[in-house]
Each structure stands twice: as structure tokens, then as C-alpha cells.
């Protein structure tokens, strides 16, 4: 049985790998566009999830699990930005 902590650790690893590849693009976009930036990114992921729930993925690395993990990471990054902005 997978635990919450295992998933959180996996999300941390995913974030670190993607951040190494893409740099800190999320924070840069957030600085420039505010909450609009994560809303658009999350909306794109939710649309992908809706599509994947209706049909099999044509792209190998776009599974439902990958998409849900991306949504979770974007939610956490948004929370980090909000908390850092508020000084919490």
C-alpha cells in the first residue's frame, strides 16, 4: 500500500528533476503574471486529465498518473508562492 509520505517524496523528486531541466520557470511566470499563471497551467493539466479519462494516451509519458502528479506539483508550487508572498 502506497502512503501519503511516499507520494509526497515522489512529487519532490519529480519537482527536482523537472526544475533541473526547465529551471525555475514557475516562479518566474508567477512573478510576471501572478495567479493567472498557475491557473492556466493547472487548467491545461485538468483538460489533459479529462481527455485521458475518455481515451488512451497517444503519447507514452502522458498517463493519468503522470497528469495527476503534475497537478499536485503545480498546486504545491502555487502554495509555495502564496506562502512566500505572505511571509508564512
Per-range role (PLM):
Residues 1-88:
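Intrinsically disordered, low-complexity regulatory regions
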Amino acid at each position: 500500500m502506497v502512503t501519503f509520505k511516499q507520494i509526497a517524496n515522489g512529487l519532490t523528486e519529480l519537482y527536482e528533476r523537472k526544475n533541473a531541466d526547465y529551471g525555475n520557470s514557475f516562479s518566474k511566470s508567477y512573478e510576471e503574471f501572478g495567479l493567472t499563471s498557475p491557473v492556466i497551467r493547472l487548467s491545461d493539466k485538468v483538460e489533459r486529465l479529462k481527455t485521458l479519462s475518455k481515451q488512451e494516451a497517444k503519447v507514452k509519458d502522458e498517463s493519468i498518473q503522470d497528469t495527476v502528479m503534475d497537478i499536485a506539483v503545480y498546486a504545491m508550487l502555487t502554495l509555495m508562492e502564496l506562502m512566500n508572498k505572505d511571509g508564512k
